[in-house]
Design a protein with these regions (language model features):
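TRNA-recognition modules of translation machinery and tRNA-sensing kinases, especially anticodon-binding
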Residues: 1-156
Length: 156
């Protein structure tokens, strides 16, 4: 029987047994990131639109594909389309740049883009990433590559 209510096109449900695989993958990502000294960061799902427009550009695909609206107070808001800008905003706003010369962060979060749904492209998707803020050392790049290699080996 077809339900009157359907998930929104471009979104998906993570159902058993897939949810068990999903949670296993998340545990591996968290564990390996922490072994390398990265700490998890969570940022709000809603951000000010200017955070993205000013940082990734007004004419980029991401800017054109944001789910945005104006709240009753006139603020232009957006569902997060990517993670680097919110991570850097939190890094600066929290003062971590003063207290942690090298701030190693990782995230696993849901993101949203108003893309035309097709194979490999969803309106809601999840992203894992790491950010090493405050270092321009090549050794930091090597560490990121090593971590990525370990993750790929563990996930198969």
């Amino acid at each position: 029987m077809k339900s009157k209510f359907q998930k929104i096109k471009g979104t998906y449900d993570i159902l058993p047994p897939e949810s068990k695989k999903w949670n296993t993958a998340i545990s591996i990502l968290q564990s390996l990131s922490e072994q390398f000294g990265y700490e998890e960061i969570k940022t709000p799902i809603i951000e000010n639109i200017d955070l993205f427009k000013q940082n990734i550009g007004y004419e980029t695909d991401v800017s054109k594909e944001m789910f945005s609206w104006e709240d009753p107070s006139g603020n232009q808001l957006v569902l997060k389309p990517e993670m680097t800008a919110p991570v850097v905003r939190a890094y600066i706003e929290s003062g971590f740049f003063r207290s942690k010369p090298l701030c190693k962060l990782f995230y696993i979060d849901a993101l949203f883009r108003r893309e035309k749904p097709q194979k490999g492209r969803q309106r809601q998707f999840h992203q894992f990433g790491i950010e090493a803020l405050g270092s321009s050392e090549v050794e930091q790049d090597v560490e990121v590559i090593l971590l990525a290699t370990k993750i790929l080996c563990h996930l198969g």
